[in-house]
């Protein structure tokens, strides 16, 4: 009986309970709420609506829902009560007039269709607006709310109605029964009815317009949450085969390999099978349950920032391309999980072909992964099929995700971007007909990365182990306490706006048939990629682990007393809070002591106790691994660290000379760490940092000179140590250039790495990235761009020696002697 009674109740609700004030609806709501409280477990988006949406609970609030559903209304009520928002079932009393606190825009399909409340919603809007005409102090906040049970987009064929159509009572019952725990209540930013009344008037036509705009809002919101319908896979393949680009590539394949047209076409289909996703809503739901269970046991929290800007872009109809940094294989799952719980469609994800092994490959494919080879070179058919598939995803309106770094960072820093997929994204725009494409840079951070031990081995020369089921199981078996996770959405980059500003005539290159490569494409793609990396770093997340690792690795003994560590963390926190790296970066709100307690729970550090107090130690075997976490936020602290290094060395220095020194070294730092400031912004940033360092007592300012404060010299020295290894690396390369101005770039990179490895052994430098090939390659390219190396390949000895002398002052004498003697074959 308990099964059929709610069903009967759902059907009854459509037959005439329209008056809120009558006694029957009150009884009815109580009866209906009982099964709903058991069947429905919804979540609110955003997580805390009032502060995140700027709702003022001291002013009247009314709710607008897309269609008449008492189940939706009661689900909304539960979330409102949970978040201290007004009860939608309690009427609003305004100037002696009682009005319902909720409005249904549409009646929705019903078992019996004689009742059409459309006019009632318009009348209620008109009543609310009319009250604003008579009361100039009144300002009702109208909050649009969507309640969704399940989010299956449906298929393009074989379904007459989409699963998320407006449901009658019986249909709604089954939706709640099966999907009650896959539901969410989406609160939208409020609309001021006072502003509406003042700007547009209060007559009935305005009320009608308000209802019409609300209907459009809900339609867009549903599309943002559910996405477009999914094609039958074979239909998608047939459409791709029929495209002119693939048809031509098939002909070229048959001719170049001297095979039949049918065989060439089979090759194309095989590539589609290799590449294409096989998206399944059922797999998304199942994985969401598993991940929800897993995250709750492995992570102490997933911190998400700036998701509202992404939801708004999806609502406005943008084609979203998520471009996260790549730390771990966990990124794929974490980002899709976060997006799903933010009320957004999980994207189609470009995954490396190395992940296409059983059983991970089929699972990832059903979660939206499409697979990409490491290189397209020498395979025109493959590149054409992949490009056309990506373009088809865009044209159909699916969100897409790819890692612009091309692979996981082994050092914790951002890698130089790989631009192939980004180039294809812009080429898709040049086909015309797509919605506006917006790139969303995303910073993903962890307090524990499960692959970090493997990364350290690979950086020291070990062969990368091929991904496989046994390797995956070994990794999963090691998962324990992973601490906190961080997903920060950076500043979006609308591609159309970018191209309009930087390539005003880009539309002249549009070709709906062929993929084009205009002359401006490559430099523009390179600039966009570099800008994306800067925006990813702008959204960096400081946390307990990376802050503690930064401080302990700065100590030559990798150990500090608890008091010293607390003081150092306070230094970092105050710098980041009072001179924020960017408006998108995040800093913990917890105190330094609380962060240390949390970091100690991660079991990465040792604590020795004596009669004086605690000493916190980073064990030698952990030191190499912990550089990964330090490097996650190196960009956020490198400028104050460089300033501290210069002041520490000189004891006192004028602002102008400090600025000159920073100006010389900044281009290398900017290129290596994707720093956000241009050179002309540096004076203001350095002034702000100097003032903050003075406020902390690290330095004193006298007659426009910065002086070291002896009473806080340890904190300043630990801050300066954050730039120590970077300056040593630069010194190696500039010394080699000065000693041999005609050295070619390849040899310069190789010899720089050799000296760095020697330095690492002799001076106990634990950072694997210290002699990473990619780091020196990037540095040498920057030296060419900055004019230290001419187009002919020769260095400018006077300039390089001047920079080396500056660097030599900032490194210790024993390190300097090792560098200078290494080129002479001495030890």
Swiss-Prot record:
EC nos: 2.3.1.15
GO BP annotation list: CDP-diacylglycerol biosynthetic process; fatty acid metabolic process
UniProt record similarity statement: Belongs to the GPAT/DAPAT family.
Pathway: Phospholipid metabolism; CDP-diacylglycerol biosynthesis; CDP-diacylglycerol from sn-glycerol 3-phosphate: step 1/3
Signal peptide: none
A single GO cellular-component term on record: plasma membrane
The name this protein goes by in its record: Glycerol-3-phosphate acyltransferase
Record HAMAP family: Glyc3P_acyltrans
Catalytic activity: sn-glycerol 3-phosphate + an acyl-CoA = a 1-acyl-sn-glycero-3-phosphate + CoA
Taxonomy, superkingdom: Bacteria
Membrane topology recorded in Swiss-Prot or TrEMBL: Peripheral membrane protein
GO molecular function, one term: glycerol-3-phosphate O-acyltransferase activity
Pfam assignment, any one: GPAT_C
Motif (HXXXXD motif): 325-330
Entry note about domains: The HXXXXD motif is essential for acyltransferase activity and may constitute the binding site for the phosphate moiety of the glycerol-3-phosphate.
Keywords: Acyltransferase, Cell inner membrane, Cell membrane, Lipid biosynthesis, Lipid metabolism, Membrane, Phospholipid biosynthesis, Phospholipid metabolism, Transferase
Annotated InterPro entries: GPAT/DHAPAT, GPAT/DHAPAT_C, GPAT/DHAPAT_LPLAT, GPAT_PlsB, Plipid/glycerol_acylTrfase
Localization, UniProt: Cell inner membrane
């Amino acid at each position: 009986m308990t099964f059929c009674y709610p069903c009967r109740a759902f059907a009854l609700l459509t037959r005439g309970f329209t008056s809120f004030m009558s006694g029957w609806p009150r009884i009815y709501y109580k009866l209906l709420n009982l099964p709903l409280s058991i069947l429905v477990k919804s979540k609110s988006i955003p997580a805390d609506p009032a502060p995140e949406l700027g709702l003022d609970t001291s002013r009247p609030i009314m709710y607008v829902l897309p269609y008449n559903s008492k189940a939706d209304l009661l689900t909304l009520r539960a979330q409102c009560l949970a978040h201290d928002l007004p009860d939608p079932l309690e009427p609003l009393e305004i100037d002696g007039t009682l009005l319902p606190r909720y409005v249904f825009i549409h009646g929705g399909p019903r078992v019996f269709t004689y009742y059409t409340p459309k006019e009632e919603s318009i009348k209620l809007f008109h009543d609310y607006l009319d009250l604003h005409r008579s009361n100039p102090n009144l300002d009702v906040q109208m909050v649009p709310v969507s309640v969704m049970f399940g989010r299956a987009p449906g298929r393009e064929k074989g379904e007459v109605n989409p699963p998320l159509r407006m449901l009658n009572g019986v249909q709604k019952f089954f939706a709640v029964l099966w999907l009650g725990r896959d539901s969410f209540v989406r609160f939208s930013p409020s609309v001021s009815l006072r502003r509406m009344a003042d700007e547009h008037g209060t007559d009935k036509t305005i009320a009608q317009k308000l209802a019409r705009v609300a209907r459009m809002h809900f339609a867009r919101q549903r599309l943002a949450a559910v996405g477009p319908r999914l094609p039958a896979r074979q239909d998608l393949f047939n459409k791709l085969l029929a495209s002119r680009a693939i048809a031509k590539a098939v002909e070229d394949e048959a001719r170049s390999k001297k095979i039949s047209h049918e065989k060439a076409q089979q090759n194309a289909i095989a590539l589609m099978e290799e590449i294409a996703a096989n998206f399944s809503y059922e797999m998304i739901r199942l994985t969401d349950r598993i991940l929800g269970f897993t995250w709750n046991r492995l992570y102490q929290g997933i911190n998400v920032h700036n998701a509202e800007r992404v939801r708004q872009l999806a609502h406005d109809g943008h084609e979203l391309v998520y471009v996260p940094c790549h730390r771990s294989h966990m990124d794929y799952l974490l980002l899709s999980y976060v997006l799903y719980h933010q009320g957004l469609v999980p994207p189609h994800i470009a995954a490396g072909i190395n992940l296409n092994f059983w059983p991970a490959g089929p699972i990832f494919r059903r979660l939206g992964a499409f697979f990409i080879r490491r290189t397209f070179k020498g395979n025109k058919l493959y590149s054409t099929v992949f490009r056309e598939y990506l373009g088809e995803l865009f044209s159909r309106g699916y969100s897409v995700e790819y890692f612009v770094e091309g692979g996981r960072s082994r050092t914790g820093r951002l890698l130089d971007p790989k631009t192939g997929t980004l180039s294809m994204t812009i080429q898709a725009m040049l086909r015309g007909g797509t919605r506006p494409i917006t790139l969303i840079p995303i910073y993903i951070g962890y307090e524990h990365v499960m692959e970090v031990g493997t990364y350290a081995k690979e950086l020291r020369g070990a062969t990368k182990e091929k991904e496989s089921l046994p390797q995956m199981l070994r990794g999963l078996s090691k998962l324990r306490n992973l601490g906190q996770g961080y997903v920060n959405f950076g500043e979006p980059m609308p591609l159309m706006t970018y191209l309009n500003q930087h390539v005003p005539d880009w539309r002249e290159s549009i070709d709906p048939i062929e993929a084009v490569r205009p002359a401006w494409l490559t430099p523009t793609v390179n600039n966009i990629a570099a800008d994306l990396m800067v925006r990813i770093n702008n959204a960096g997340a400081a946390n307990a682990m990376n802050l503690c690792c930064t401080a302990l690795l700065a100590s030559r003994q990798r150990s500090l007393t608890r008091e010293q560590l607390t003081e150092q963390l306070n230094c970092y926190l105050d710098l980041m809070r009072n001179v924020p790296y960017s408006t998108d970066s995040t800093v913990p709100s917890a105190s330094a002591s609380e962060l240390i307690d949390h970091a100690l729970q991660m079991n990465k550090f040792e604590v020795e106790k004596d009669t004086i107090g605690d000493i916190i130690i980073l064990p030698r075997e952990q030191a190499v691994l912990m550089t990964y976490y330090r490097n996650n936020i190196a960009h956020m602290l490198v400028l104050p660290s460089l300033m501290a290094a210069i002041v520490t060395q000189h004891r006192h220095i004028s602002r102008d000379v400090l600025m000159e020194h920073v100006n010389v070294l900044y281009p290398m730092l900017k290129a290596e760490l994707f720093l956000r400031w241009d050179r002309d912004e540096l004076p203001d940033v350095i002034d702000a940092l100097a003032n903050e360092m003075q406020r902390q007592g690290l330095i004193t300012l006298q007659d426009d000179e910065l002086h070291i404060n002896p009473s806080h010299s340890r904190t300043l020295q630990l801050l300066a140590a954050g730039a120590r290894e970077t300056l040593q690396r630069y010194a190696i390369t500039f010394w080699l250039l000065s000693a041999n101005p005609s050295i070619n770039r390849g040899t310069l990179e190789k010899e720089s790495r050799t000296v760095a490895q020697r330095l690492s052994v002799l001076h106990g430098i634990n950072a694997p990235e210290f002699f990473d090939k990619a780091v020196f390659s990037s540095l040498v390219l920057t030296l060419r761009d900055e004019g230290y190396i001419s187009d002919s390949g020769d260095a400018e000895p006077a300039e390089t020696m001047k920079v080396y002398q500056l660097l030599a002052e900032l490194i210790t004498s024993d390190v300097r002697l090792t560098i200078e003697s290494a080129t002479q074959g001495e030890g």
